[in-house]
Amino acid sequence: MAATIQSVKARQIFDSRGNPTVEVDVFCSDGTFARAAVPSGASTGVYEALELRDGGSYYLGKGVSKAVNNVNSVIGPALIGKDPTAQTEIDNFMVQQLDGTKNEWGWCKQKLGANAILAVSLAVCKAGASIKRIPLYQHIANLAGNKQLVLPVPAFNVINGGSHAGNKLAMQEFMILPTGAASFKEAMKMGVEVYHHLKSVIKKKYGQDATNVGDEGGFAPNIQENKEGLELLKTAIEKAGYTGKVVIGMDVAASEFYSDKDQTYDLNFKEENNDGSQKISGDSLKNVYKSFVSEYPIVSIEDPFDQDDWVHYAKMTEEIGEQVQIVGDDLLVTNPTRVAKAIKEKSCNALLLKVNQIGSVTESIEAVKMSKRAGWGVMTSHRSGETEDTFIADLAVGLSTGQIKTGAPCRSERLAKYNQLLRIEEELGAIAVYAGAKFRAPVEPY
């Protein structure tokens, strides 16, 4: 007799920013128990599936009792008796039948909330792995039809700007990627050493308070020039002795400083009542990136333009997409329909995989498979408001995305994922493969 779902229980817990989020427990007939919690983002794309919040004054409108109630009274009862190893069936049932809301980009989860559906989807996935008595990453690989497991290159967000920090820096994340490491364990060593060198470089140059950390564990020194951020990384990498082995990635989150009115990007957007002297066109911004790429070892640029600026995305991908990965986050929101459009229009060449943008494991797998078949890279990602849940570590290995960004090597909700990857590498032993320099295409498409 196959194990079935006996009960599903949701509760409100808190993310790393002190905002409410949803956690779900799934109990099965064979005694299996699984628990999952969902994260939430600060710079959210307008095309993301609906994250259901309560509104009102409690928790400044960010309560999730409606989403919790939707799990406890609608989703949970409907899943009793179902087989938790049948991930696709359960996800499709929740998304298409129990919720059923659609917009031009597909299933939008507006009735029950992507946070409610995803929490259940993640917990069911963990339960399915337990029932099959296989590790979660292997269960995910089986669901996707992926035959080769690969440990991802970590992209550590060590300098924060944009909506994540109180400094004047327009661009949101400056990351280091230890592509020259031979294993994930060695990548952690390189990343951690560069991080500590960076801390002392920043402290010396900007003072002790510049080493306070942001939401994702990175530093937020009060610099305004984006180039200064790159310079700090270059210096820290040199001091650690990893020049050529540790490279640089950026997440610009340009939608945050784009003005639809005059179609410009304001690199001084955090200065109130600024004179507009740093507003530039999409073409000028593209040239800023090109100059960065020629001067620094940059291998990845995420969200270089606004989420609706398909034109400049395509231009940039055509011009420097061979040497640099152009990653769509707000542009794609892990949505298979938007991914298909971007593949057709050659808008970018890599997917940022955030399970809570789309709201189910099945749709996430679909977006990844489409991306890989198009020859794209895939980077698994956390959100700025995280929990101690480590699902995305197993997801990155199971789907062999080749890359993961889950913050700096600082703050427990970030390290939880990196530590899980260390455990997975150890468990795989001799068959463990680290993506390294092949992070953009670590496996053949599956």
Swiss-Prot record:
Binding site for Mg(2+): 251, 302, 329
Matches recorded under PROSITE patterns: ENOLASE
BP GO annotations: glycolytic process
Recorded superkingdom: Eukaryota
Swiss-Prot/TrEMBL cofactor(s): Mg(2+)
Matches recorded under SMART domains: Enolase_C, Enolase_N
Note on cofactor: Mg(2+) is required for catalysis and for stabilizing the dimer.
Positions contributing to substrate binding: 164, 173, 302, 329, 381-384, 405
Pathway participation: Carbohydrate degradation; glycolysis; pyruvate from D-glyceraldehyde 3-phosphate: step 4/5
GO terms of molecular function: magnesium ion binding; phosphopyruvate hydratase activity
Alphabetically ordered keywords of this record: Cytoplasm, Glycolysis, Lyase, Magnesium, Metal-binding
Protein's cellular compartments: Cytoplasm
EC number annotated for this UniProt entry: 4.2.1.11
Main localization category: cytoplasm
A cellular component annotation (GO) from this entry: phosphopyruvate hydratase complex
Active site: 216, 354
InterPro entries xrefs: Enolase, Enolase-like_C_sf, Enolase-like_N, Enolase_C, Enolase_CS, Enolase_N
Reactions the enzyme catalyzes: (2R)-2-phosphoglycerate = phosphoenolpyruvate + H2O
Family annotation (HAMAP family): Enolase (MF_00318)
Subunit structure and binding partners: Homodimer.
Family, similarity comment: Belongs to the enolase family.
UniProt-recorded name of the protein: Enolase 2
Lineage summary: Eukaryota, Viridiplantae, Streptophyta, Embryophyta, Tracheophyta
